[in-house]
């Protein structure tokens, strides 16, 4: 068995960025995924994870030759051994977007065989103070903090520069039972909602400590919903995505549309406006609370019908023929079975909202097997300072 490299210090030439936010380097036939580095740099790195095999992970602990795009992180904890939340605070914001664009383009080429230039667009508001939902955990001293990267270790914080300003003050000012997990949400009215989390029989449950019903604004509507249910964490993301879905879906008057992985019905509301009272919109969502919130918020749109359950279990009963399908699957993507079921409905247009470029590329390849082509794609920096990127793809 090969001797473990864990803890080993290596001098590395850093290569391109990889999916997941690490940069790639190679030593003695092995691949190293390096955090806190940038392409083209020369660094000293400490191996932080080695499970054997062809790759391991490392942190850049000293920059020997830095990139012109390197900056001082706005948070001192965005460093080796610090908080695990941000990946690229050490890069200029514009360069962060270039790195994300490179990842999206590489995944499309590698997994879908598509060569395409990608531009990641910034959202209004800048790279700090945008995160409206934060999960904290209490350390041994009862002080709430954030977890280190790939670790249960709690890093104590005084604040978080990417969080909505002031949103963490209450949680950080108190002492909690060690191990307590907390979720803080700031809604569209800047109301704060604090929940204590617990895992019971493998399911996350919450005890509301303050707030509870959030008010959000998007797609020309006011939304009243569970503060801790799914909603885009960037304040500008929901409206940006809804308007692009409106443009690309172009559902015909009196037509049929599906909104898959519908959440509370943000995109269903857009589709309902397009098809009108004589059309049909089917919204499928597995979260029961989200369905309840969606039914209440869209009660004025009788053309929207809701189904609660997993998309792969319910899509077979969806009304056909369908004119347009919008889907916003979880990070793992829709998968071949759901793609096949969508294709059987023969929609003219498919609008795919994706939070993971690899899953998007795999599903685009599955759609291509049914004759669908990627005709447009836009990407948004809905998660500044992290490696995450939100994409919207149009397939026809």
Segments from the language model and where they lie:
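S-adenosylmethionine
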Residues: 307-389
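Accessory RNA-recognition modules of RNA-modification enzymes
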Residues: 1-327, 332-340, 346
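Conserved beta strand-loop-helix elements of the APE1-like EEP
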Residues: 393-396
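A structure-centric signal for secondary-structure junctions around beta-strands
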Residues: 131, 389-390
């Amino acid at each position: 068995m090969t001797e473990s490299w864990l803890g080993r210090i290596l001098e590395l030439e850093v290569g391109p960025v990889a999916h997941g936010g690490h940069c790639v380097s190679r030593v003695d036939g092995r691949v190293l995924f390096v955090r806190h580095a940038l392409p083209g740099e020369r660094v000293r790195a400490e191996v932080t994870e080695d499970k054997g095999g062809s790759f391991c992970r490392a942190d850049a602990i000293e920059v020997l030759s830095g990139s012109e795009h390197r900056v001082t992180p706005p948070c001192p904890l965005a460093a080796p051994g610090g908080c695990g939340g941000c990946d690229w605070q050490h890069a200029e914001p514009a360069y962060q977007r270039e790195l994300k664009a490179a990842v999206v383009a590489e995944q499309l080429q590698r997994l879908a065989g598509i060569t395409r230039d990608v531009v990641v667009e910034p959202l209004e508001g800048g790279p700090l103070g945008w995160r409206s939902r934060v999960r904290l955990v209490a350390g041994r001293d009862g002080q709430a903090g954030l977890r280190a990267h790939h670790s249960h270790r709690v890093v104590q914080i005084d604040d978080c520069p990417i969080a909505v300003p002031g949103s963490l003050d209450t949680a950080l000012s108190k002492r909690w039972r060690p191990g307590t997990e907390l979720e803080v949400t700031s809604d569209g009215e800047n109301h704060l909602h604090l929940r204590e989390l617990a895992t019971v029989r493998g399911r996350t449950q919450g005890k509301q400590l303050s707030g509870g019903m959030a008010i959000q604004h998007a797609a020309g509507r006011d939304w009243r919903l569970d503060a801790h249910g799914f909603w885009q964490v960037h304040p500008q993301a929901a409206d940006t995505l809804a308007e692009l879905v409106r443009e690309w879906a172009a559902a015909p008057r009196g037509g049929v549309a599906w909104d898959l992985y519908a959440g509370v019905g943000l995109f269903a509301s857009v589709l309902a406006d397009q098809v009108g009272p004589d059309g049909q919109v089917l919204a499928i969502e597995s979260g029961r609370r989200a369905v309840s919130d969606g039914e209440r918020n869209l009660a004025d749109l009788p053309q929207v019908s809701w189904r609660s359950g997993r998309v792969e279990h319910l899509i077979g009963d969806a009304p056909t023929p369908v004119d347009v399908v919008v889907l916003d699957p979880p990070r793992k993507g829709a998968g071949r079975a759901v793609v096949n079921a969508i294709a059987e409905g023969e929609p003219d247009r498919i609008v795919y909202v994706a939070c993971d470029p690899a899953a998007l590329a795999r599903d685009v390849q599955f759609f291509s097997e049914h004759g669908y082509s990627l005709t447009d794609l836009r990407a948004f920096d809905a998660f500044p300072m992290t490696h995450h990127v939100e994409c919207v793809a149009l397939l026809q």
